[in-house]
């Protein structure tokens, strides 16, 4: 019983540490809600959130809570996410909108928005290190990369050609069906199938999305007049987007051998 309690506490502590970037962002969303659309010293809420996110990123690196290698892959995901944001918030598409003004923005997207995706990348990168994660039966990186890129492209191409998300779901199931995730705590080692882990993470992000829209960080068209919970269908979107972040992290921060075993590079923490 004592060992179980120790494992639970250690797991939760490491999970909170890995998700630190995202947790701090959510707290800021709540605490700045009353700022609304008013300007304070020439800047708006989104601008202060950008400065806040930059400070968090600096502190994570300065305090060595995040490595430069991790920061590089997170930055790549950040850029790809911003490109998708610019497309999907264009008035002709309007999948969602940022309802408040900003000084620092690119077209319809405030610059802080990319850091919400950075928080996801940060969680993946830090989790792999904190839990000493090892994957077995991991597919080759080429099929994983093709799946991730097609998922990314489908977010935008579905407005012009048929939506292939269900094909991508089935492909991901076939691809990762045998993949296992091993993670280490001080007193125990655990093994889980990869697919349920991805679904759980997608659900957690869906909860964070509901918090974010409630505090008007962004809004879907149906939420503009009155807030309501984000539809369950968004779980699938987050699941597919997680694949892109995961593949980038796995490719840059680790090595996969010929038997499908993946582990962090020894230099990944430098």
Regions found by a protein language model. Give the residues of each.
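Aromatic-rich, lipid-facing transmembrane alpha helices and their immediate juxtamembrane interface loops
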Residues: 1-270
């Amino acid at each position: 019983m004592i060992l179980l309690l120790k494992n639970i506490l250690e797991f939760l502590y490491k999970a909170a540490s890995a998700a630190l970037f995202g947790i701090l962002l959510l707290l800021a969303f709540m605490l700045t809600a009353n700022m609304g659309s008013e300007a304070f010293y020439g800047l708006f809420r989104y601008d202060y959130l950008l400065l806040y996110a930059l400070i968090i990123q600096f502190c994570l690196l300065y305090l060595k809570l995040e490595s430069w290698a991790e920061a590089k892959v997170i930055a790549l995901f950040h850029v790809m996410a911003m490109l998708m944001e610019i497309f999907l918030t264009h008035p002709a598409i309007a999948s969602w909108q940022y309802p408040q003004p900003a000084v620092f923005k690119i077209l319809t997207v405030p610059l802080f928005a990319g850091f919400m995706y950075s928080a996801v990348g940060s969680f993946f990168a830090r989790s792999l290190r904190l839990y000493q994660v090892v994957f077995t039966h991991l597919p080759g990186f080429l099929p994983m990369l093709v799946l991730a890129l097609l998922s990314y492209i489908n977010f935008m191409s579905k407005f012009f050609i048929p939506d292939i998300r269900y094909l991508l779901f089935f492909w991901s199931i076939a691809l990762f069906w045998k993949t296992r995730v091993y993670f280490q705590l001080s007193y125990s080692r655990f093994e889980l199938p990869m697919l349920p882990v991805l679904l759980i993470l997608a659900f957690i992000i869906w909860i964070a999305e509901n918090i974010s829209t409630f505090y008007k960080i962004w809004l879907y068209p149906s939420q503009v007049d009155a807030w309501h919970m984000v539809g369950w269908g968004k779980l699938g979107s987050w699941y597919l987007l997680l694949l892109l972040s995961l593949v980038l992290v796995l490719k840059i921060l680790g090595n996969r051998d010929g038997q499908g075993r993946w582990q962090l590079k020894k230099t990944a923490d430098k």
